[in-house]
């Protein structure tokens, strides 16, 4: 069994894939496995990966899989999980890269602490600017209960750090069904995944290796595109709320889920001019319907704890939604 499997989905990233592959080579070990998943690229990425699979096979174990149609990053990661054989599992996106030696440091930390998963800080790269983004957990190199790291509801916590590629996960989590992503979500697929992991895993730790470089602001990224796919955050958070409401600690955890949902919704509404006009209209309609679906007493409490601008924006939408429902 390989010590570590790194699952790397690629889709139309020919410009960046060579950097990603070079960084994998700089982290290779004979007991590491690289799972390269091509999500039906049509820009030349496939040829890059064919060469990469041959090159990397001399320094590590390699599995190269190609989808027969584009299925999205959630499905590509799931395909990688199905192929991966490692004791530990990690993720990397096809347009990001790793510092040399990072993976060995990550595995050493995970083995030393012997917990279900470990998380790391990462470097956000925007053009030439680089910023370290830290896991919002105060204790380092100490095994913690991931449930406790969900709270408090009114602070930035570990479930707000949705960088699935900044960490490593023991195979037992995969065997328990905790590492698969919800397919069909075009964005925010990492949010239900992160919540489920924190609710269901038994232990985790934040460790010090810093070596993931995340490209931000790529023109093809969904964060830069104003089409209907970005509205999938609503389906993602509906899933979070539904699953958390069924949890044994729902009374304790649900306020955080609702607050996070409201915060992300308010963020998108504040930037609705970046959406295509028809999509902006759907954003308002779908957000209003989502507010109606939330537990109303809890929603009222959450809005009272949010800052004035975001709370006012959501209250206006909530009033319109209520008026529209009454008129109907």
Please annotate each region the language model reported.
Residues 1-232:
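Nucleotide-sugar donor-binding/catalytic module of glycosyltransferases
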Residues 31, 273-328:
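Membrane-interface aromatic/basic loop that binds lipid-linked glycans or pyrophosphate carriers
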């Amino acid at each position: 069994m390989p010590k570590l499997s790194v699952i790397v989905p690629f889709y139309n990233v020919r410009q960046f894939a060579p950097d990603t592959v070079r960084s994998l080579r700089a982290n290779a070990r004979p007991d590491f496995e690289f799972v390269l998943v091509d999500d039906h690229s049509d820009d030349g990425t496939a040829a890059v990966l064919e060469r990469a699979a041959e090159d990397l096979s001399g320094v590590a174990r390699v599995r190269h899989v190609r989808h027969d149609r584009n299925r999205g990053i959630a499905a590509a990661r799931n395909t990688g999980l199905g192929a991966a054989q490692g004791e530990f599992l990690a993720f990397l996106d096809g347009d990001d890269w790793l510092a040399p030696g990072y993976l060995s440091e990550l595995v050493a930390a995970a083995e030393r602490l012997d917990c279900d998963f470990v998380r790391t800080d990462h470097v956000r790269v925007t053009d030439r600017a680089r910023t370290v983004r830290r896991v919002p957990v105060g204790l380092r190199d100490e095994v913690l209960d991931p449930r406790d790291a969900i709270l408090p509801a009114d602070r930035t916590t570990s479930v707000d750090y949705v960088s699935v590629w900044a960490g490593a996960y023991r195979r037992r989590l995969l065997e328990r069904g905790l590492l698969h992503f919800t397919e069909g979500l075009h964005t925010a697929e990492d949010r239900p995944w992160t919540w489920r992991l924190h609710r269901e895993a038994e232990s985790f730790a934040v460790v010090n290796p810093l070596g993931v470089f995340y490209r931000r602001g790529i023109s093809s990224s969904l964060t830069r595109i104003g089409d209907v796919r970005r509205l999938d955050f609503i389906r993602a958070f509906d899933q979070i709320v539904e699953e958390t409401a069924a949890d044994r600690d729902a009374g304790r955890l649900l306020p955080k889920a609702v607050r996070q949902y409201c915060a992300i919704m308010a963020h998108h509404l504040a930037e609705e001019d970046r959406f295509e006009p028809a999509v902006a209209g759907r954003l308002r309609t779908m957000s209003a319907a989502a507010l109606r679906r939330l537990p109303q007493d809890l929603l009222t409490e959450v809005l009272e704890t949010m800052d004035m601008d975001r709370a006012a924006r959501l209250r206006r939408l909530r009033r319109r939604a209520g008026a529209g429902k009454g008129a109907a």
